[in-house]
Amino acid sequence: MTQTLGAWGRSYEIIVIDDGSTDDSFAILARLQASDPRLRVIRFRKNFGQTAAFAAGFAHARGRLIATSDGDLQNDPRDIPMMVAKAEEGYDIVCGWRKSRQDAWLSRLLPSKIANAIISRATGVRLHDYGCSLKIFRAEVVKSLRLYGEMHRFLPAIASEMGVTIAEMVVNHRARQHGTSKYGISRTIRVILDLLTVKFLLSYSTRPLQIFGLIGLAMGAAGALVTGYLAYVRLIGEQSIANRPALLFGILLLFSEIGRAHV
């Protein structure tokens, strides 16, 4: 990283997030930081996940353009200069596309292709590789976003609501030499749940009253069903409904819809 950026001739800083590592990573990073003022290390006391790491990096970054990359050495830093050049053409986000991805087909590539197709369809922002961490962002774009869960992978889709311009570029991807991936089925489930959240936000963030309108209609329909049933019980079945909690519940649901209609 330092060799590539140093030869590039541009000013830069490197922010490394130690996401609760259990080996000697932090000790090594601390020694490197002592000898290079451009390196900044942020340490989490426990593992908070990639989204929290991204959020911390965005918050502490001081440059106008921010590059993100995984720590598994599969992303190639030599792609950063060309991606920055693309951003300087006027794009707010430049996304990497690992077209020749060096991962197992069944366990990584196939699920990734399916996930990218689903995310692109659900969000309306079509990218080949949402999971590629190698991206360039304009600082003002990501610093205004609030991230949680597994939402780092949806950044382009979330930011699209701000009217940003997005480009995608083919980048190099190297085979993993050290460690093993922590991605598994539980991670996939969390991603799906967060995708539902993102879809909800993208659908109603600019028209929040519509969701309340839908909720109000549902409540009104439920109230009509409840009171209609109770009316049937009283008139046809000739049973008393005065002491039934459902009567009060149905009336409240109906009045909530009537009140919404007159606001």
Q: Which sequence ranges carry the predicted segments?
A:
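Short hydrophobic "helix-edge" motifs at membrane interfaces and signal-peptide entry regions
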Residues: 13-14, 61, 128-129, 206, ...
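Conserved hydrophobic residues forming the short capping helix/wall of the S-adenosyl-L-methionine
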Residues: 2-5, 29-33, 87
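Acceptor/aglycone-binding surface of glycosyltransferases and processive sugar-polymer synthases
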Residues: 31, 38-60, 65, 77-161, ...
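A conserved acidic beta->alpha catalytic loop
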Residues: 18-27, 73
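Hydrophobic helical membrane-anchoring modules
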Residues: 150, 154-262
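Short beta-strand/loop segment that forms part of the nucleotide-sugar
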Residues: 2, 8-21, 42-43
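Histidine kinase transmitter module recognition
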Residues: 4, 8, 17, 86, ...
